[in-house]
Amino acid sequence: MTQQTMSFQAEVKQLLHLMIHSLYSNKEIFLRELVSNASDAADKLRFEALENNALYESDPNLRIRLSFDKAARTITIDDNGIGMSRDEAIANLGTIARSGTKEFFSKLSGDQQKDAALIGQFGVGFYSGFIVADRITVETRRAGLPASEGVRWESAGEGDFQVDTIERAARGTTITLHLREGEDELLSSYRLKSIVQKYSDHVALPILMKKEEWDQEKGEMVEKDEDETINQASALWTRAKSEVTDEQYKQFYQHVAHDHQDPLAWTHNRVEGRSEYTQLLFVPSHAPFDLWNRDYRGGLKLYVKRVFIMDDAEQLLPQYLRFIKGVVDSSDLPLNVSREILQESRDVKAIREGVTKRALSMLEELANAEDDAGKEKYKTFWSAFGQVLKEGIGEDHANRERVAKLLRFASTHGDTDAQDVALADYVARMKPEQTKIYYVTADTWQAAKNSPHLEVFRKKGVEVLLLTDRVDEWMLSFLHEFDGKPLASVARGDLDLGALNDDEKKAQEETGEAMKPVVDKMKETLGEKVKDVRVTFRLTDSPSCLVADDNDMSGYLQRMLKAAGQSAPSFQPILEINPEHPLVKALKADGADFGDWCHLLFDQALLAEGGALEDPASFVKRTNALLLSRAA
């Protein structure tokens, strides 16, 4: 086939411009990305060769070779991995097939350090070569194809690329970077080695360079016809913990998670017994951009006896821990394991249970840290992943108690929206006569904090948790108690503060009897709007509030379901009135404006809890009429 000249996809042109003009100060990343791609190519070959050993073509020793040519001003990265066919070269090097292209550009922050890390995360690392090169030549042949089906791909990064069919005996890919002016400092064995050791020391494949020795006569380093391995070349998780430095763990995390930031914590151990496996797990310091996407694929990298099997093996972790990154290397699973087999395997179930326990232990260690740095780390974790962790209350019955101890909430104990109160902290501060853990749900912290339902709790100095995450109502349908103390909504049912409100209860019964004519007339006036009307002692400043019956859906949950486009039963609340409030005291069952006052008290209560009025115009008209009558 003759040479073809083709145009880059529009997004690639934009990306090339970014690489060349915006990321220059962090140019070392080009080598990290190209070595990482070479490592992936070797993993893919190993995986495909499980079913077709002939793909090794009598060259089973996988490696990456790095070289440079001072005279030609080139750097070459060569691998004997899976290689590419002509169609694959065009698809992989000329277009970005991922749906995340737009997200990639929207995430660019202008911070070169952060933006550089996004490159690997979005699978566009190859183009980082243009940071230092004004021309890139790729020669490749896919394993299993004849030598006559080699491919040469070349581009100057200016919108077009050329593809040609060539004769290539060797399997794999050779990338040659033709350096830009001013990049000659990279043409040094020492410089290239230092970049590899900084970013790619953990790569399980040997990275080879020609050995150099000092030549006394020439007064310079001279290349020898002998290879040396310039990285550790062993899978980091297979080493003893004592042999791995914190810096190496951090670099490995950045490689495996495609993340530029350090992890908050990690755990590394080998499990022996019924199932034998090694796990190296990390807690990231921030959430990925697509964590809440429906098609987000979390999970760990799965290896079997050090052979890479798959990315995103979500069967190894429950959904609520999908943010955990890392590697599991099993000694028991078959090498031809598929995602379908993973779902049915007993060994996988045992691994999943073990990984879950280990991940929770890691989070418990973070949560229970007593030093300021440790506490700050858990705050960072909670801010990024707290809402995801709450899913575990409903998903993981076996570990529900452990997950509950990790939860954090805002509360009336502090005057900020910081979610830093553990359920154990709340229980430790409970009043001697208090038997329940009280909470209120709302759309915002401000709405929760100012909820009229909290008035009696403030009066009595009883702490209330302020729950404002969308997942909270769902979570509470599974979290019924903690440490033997039931959780109770301050906006549901007939409020019972136990011994804390004996006097008020007695007074409420007496007042309720005295106000029965007014209450009955209000119920008749409001009709289907309310399930009931009753006198309450839970209010001290507000004239009225709405509460849900014990077995009914709350107004907050109903609004949330509607916002999500789901059907929800109509909300028929109980209207509670404060008999000590002047507006309620002024109510007269036989008054001409009694109906207007009833509707006003209902509408005010609905607004106070974050609800929406069905007929705002009537509310305004009614309010104006009552104001005018008072003014007169």
Curated annotation (Swiss-Prot):
InterPro entries: HATPase_C_sf (IPR036890), Heat_shock_protein_90_CS (IPR019805), HSP90_C (IPR037196), Hsp90_fam (IPR001404), Hsp90_N (IPR020575), Ribosomal_Su5_D2-typ_SF (IPR020568). One of its GO terms (cellular component) is cytoplasm. GO terms for molecular function: ATP binding; ATP hydrolysis activity; ATP-dependent protein folding chaperone; unfolded protein binding. Residues 560-632 are annotated as: C. Residues 1-339 are annotated as: A. It is found in: Cytoplasm. The keyword ATP-binding applies. Pfam families: HATPase_c_3, HSP90. Residues 340-559 are annotated as: B. The keyword Manganese does not apply. SUPFAM superfamilies: ATPase domain of HSP90 chaperone/DNA topoisomerase II/histidine kinase, HSP90 C-terminal domain, Ribosomal protein S5 domain 2-like. Belongs to the heat shock protein 90 family. Homodimer. Molecular chaperone. Has ATPase activity. PANTHER family: HEAT SHOCK PROTEIN 90 FAMILY MEMBER (PTHR11528). This is Chaperone protein HtpG.
